[in-house]
């Protein structure tokens, strides 16, 4: 895996799924391929994106700044600085300085990532902030190692909370989760259906699932009742996937 592919993989792992993720993936690919050289416009676009957390925006802004060539005097952006200040915690700043000194001695992406992984997310973000604010310099490769370590830390905690939701024994949460997944899968099927012969069938399956979820939410049902909806939709989906040759989000 090339360095930029690895960076793209880690950065996208912390972006919530949805149309925005596809858009961000496209921007990253363009930036890494040298096709997008207007850093100012890119940062303005990033700043106004909904859904993303300030830290995710900060990390993306840092990656864009590292990658897109720009004039030396170009102003640093406040939204990136605020996101990479380690929540203003002086402990994070102290640790960030220690980490920065260690990173100065590293020359490879993997070496930097390894060193950075032993620090907390707050310290890692603060260290990125130091580099972003030009208070310190490291090679681009080392900076990317720091980015990927930070994304791995964030993705780990997201995975833990996702796993907690999936394994929760609270039937109300499981029920709602199944209905949300049914809705998003239906939406994805409708979007994909546009260009296939099975479009009518896909739209029909998706529409039924939507109506069912809507009815359940309106009337209120027993938490176990969505299990049947999930099984039906899953069955239809799998048959549809086989014909389409695609793999879609799995249900829990």
From Swiss-Prot:
Keyword terms of this UniProt record: Host nucleus, Membrane, RNA-binding, Viral matrix protein, Virion
Signal peptide: none
Span list, region RNP-binding: 165-252
InterPro entries: Flu_matrix_M1 (IPR036039), Flu_matrix_M1_C (IPR013188), Flu_matrix_M1_N (IPR001561), Flu_matrix_M1_N_sub1 (IPR015423), Flu_matrix_M1_N_sub2 (IPR015799), INFV_M1 (IPR037533)
UniProt KW RNA-binding keyword: yes
GO cellular component, one term: host cell nucleus
Gene3D superfamilies, alphabetized: 1.10.10.180, 1.20.91.10
Miscellaneous remark of the record: SC35 was derived from A/Seal/Massachussetts/1/80 (H7N7) by serial passages in chicken embryo cells, thereby acquiring a multibasic cleavage site in its hemagglutinin (HA) and becoming 100% lethal for chickens. SC35 was then passaged 11 times in mouse lung, yielding the mouse-adapted variant SC35M.
Function comment: Plays critical roles in virus replication, from virus entry and uncoating to assembly and budding of the virus particle. M1 binding to ribonucleocapsids (RNPs) in nucleus seems to inhibit viral transcription. Interaction of viral NEP with M1-RNP is thought to promote nuclear export of the complex, which is targeted to the virion assembly site at the apical plasma membrane in polarized epithelial cells. Interactions with NA and HA may bring M1, a non-raft-associated protein, into lipid rafts. Forms a continuous shell on the inner side of the lipid bilayer in virion, where it binds the RNP. Determines the virion's shape: spherical or filamentous. Clinical isolates of influenza are characterized by the presence of significant proportion of filamentous virions, whereas after multiple passage on eggs or cell culture, virions have only spherical morphology. Filamentous virions are thought to be important to infect neighboring cells, and spherical virions more suited to spread through aerosol between hosts organisms.
Family: Belongs to the influenza viruses Matrix protein M1 family.
Subunit structure: Homodimer and homomultimer. Interacts with NEP. Binds ribonucleocapsid by both interacting with genomic RNA and NP protein. May interact with HA and NA. Cannot bind NP without genomic RNA.
Name of this chain's protein: Matrix protein 1
Source species of the chain: Influenza A virus (strain A/Seal/Massachusetts/1/1980 H7N7)
Name of the gene encoding the protein in the UniProt record: M
């Amino acid at each position: 895996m090339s360095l930029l592919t690895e960076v793209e993989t880690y950065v996208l792992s912390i972006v919530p799924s949805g149309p925005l993720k596809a858009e961000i993936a496209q921007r990253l690919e363009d930036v890494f391929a040298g096709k997008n050289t207007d850093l100012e416009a890119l940062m303005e676009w990033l700043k106004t994106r909904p859904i993303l957390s300030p830290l995710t925006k900060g990390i993306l802004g840092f990656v864009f700044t590292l990658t897109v060539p720009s004039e030396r005097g170009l102003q640093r952006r406040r939204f990136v600085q605020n996101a990479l200040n380690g929540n203003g915690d002086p402990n994070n700043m102290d640790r960030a300085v220690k980490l920065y000194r260690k990173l100065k001695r590293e020359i490879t992406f993997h070496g930097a990532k390894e060193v950075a992984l032993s620090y907390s997310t707050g310290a890692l973000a603060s260290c990125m902030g130091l580099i972003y604010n030009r208070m310190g310099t490291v090679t681009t490769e080392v900076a990317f190692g720091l980015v990927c370590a930070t994304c791995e830390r964030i993705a780990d905690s997201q995975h833990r909370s996702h796993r907690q939701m999936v394994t929760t024994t609270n039937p109300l949460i499981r029920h709602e989760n199944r209905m949300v997944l049914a809705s998003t899968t239906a939406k994805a099927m409708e979007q994909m259906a546009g260009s296939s012969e099975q479009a009518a069938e896909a739209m029909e399956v998706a529409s039924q699932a939507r109506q069912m979820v809507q009815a359940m939410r309106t009337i209120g049902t027993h938490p176990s009742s969505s299990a049947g909806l999930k099984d039906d939709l899953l069955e239809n989906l799998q048959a549809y996937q086989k014909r389409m040759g695609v793999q879609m989000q799995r249900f829990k």
